[in-house]
Amino acid sequence: MKKEKAVVVFSGGQDSTTCLFWAIEQFAEVEAVTFNYNQRHKLEIDCAAKIAKELGIKHTVLDMSLLNQLAPNALTRTDMEITHEEGELPSTFVDGRNLLFLSFAAVLAKQVGARHIVTGVCETDFSGYPDCRDVFVKSLNVTLNLSMDYPFVIHTPLMWIDKAETWKLSDELGAFEFVREKTLTCYNGIIGDGCGECPACQLRKAGLDTYLQEREGANN
């Protein structure tokens, strides 16, 4: 894969930034694509742009505001509370988001001569999002190949690892401090360790604490 090109679906968060570093190591050329769907905090787009610029990665931002018109939710509406009731999809789930993002990433990838698409979706820390499942990604990969008669390969480096292992991967890639200090995971738009209270921050912190304990134990 070292001679090939990849497009990374990039939000500027922990997972997609780890995937960006993974792609940089795996491929000869990497581009990043970020989607503006009127998310709760526009800082996410700014954060992604800054990271891409710092890493020297060509970065494209695509307007997906139509998604907010079709599927208003807690990620795009400040007047909706972030909730997750047992047996129901989280209020942060955006219908069709990964379906559309990966489809548009594929269109871009073909235009720039890339076969490979990298995304940070994950089943292990499954948050109730059906479009983060491996079966969905594999199905969409086949559909995209058929729809454009092009041999795409969708890579999901985080699919079977948890948040602690994602921190470990960033460390192995030499990006641990970068990811910890410069990425935006927080639903409230606070870069780095975030607000510490929203579900995204809690999941991120739990994984970080577990990994740091494991790393300290391994060094003793």
From Swiss-Prot:
Binds 1 zinc ion per subunit. It comes from the Bacteria. Keywords: ATP-binding, Ligase, Metal-binding, Nucleotide-binding, Queuosine biosynthesis, Zinc. Pathway: Purine metabolism; 7-cyano-7-deazaguanine biosynthesis. ATP binds at F10, S11, G12, G13, Q14, D15, S16, T17, T18, C19, L20. GO terms for molecular function: ATP binding; ligase activity, forming carbon-nitrogen bonds; zinc ion binding. It catalyses: 7-carboxy-7-deazaguanine + NH4(+) + ATP = 7-cyano-7-deazaguanine + ADP + phosphate + H2O + H(+). Its EC number is 6.3.4.20. Its cofactor is Zn(2+). One of its GO terms (biological process) is queuosine biosynthetic process. Transmembrane segments: none annotated. It holds the Pfam family QueC. Zn(2+) binds at C186, C195, C198, C201. SUPFAM superfamilies: Adenine nucleotide alpha hydrolases-like. Homodimer. Catalyzes the ATP-dependent conversion of 7-carboxy-7-deazaguanine (CDG) to 7-cyano-7-deazaguanine (preQ(0)). Belongs to the QueC family. NCBIfam families: 7-cyano-7-deazaguanine synthase QueC. This is 7-cyano-7-deazaguanine synthase. It comes from Bacillus cereus (strain G9842). The lineage of its organism: Bacteria, Bacillati, Bacillota, Bacilli, Bacillales. The gene is queC.
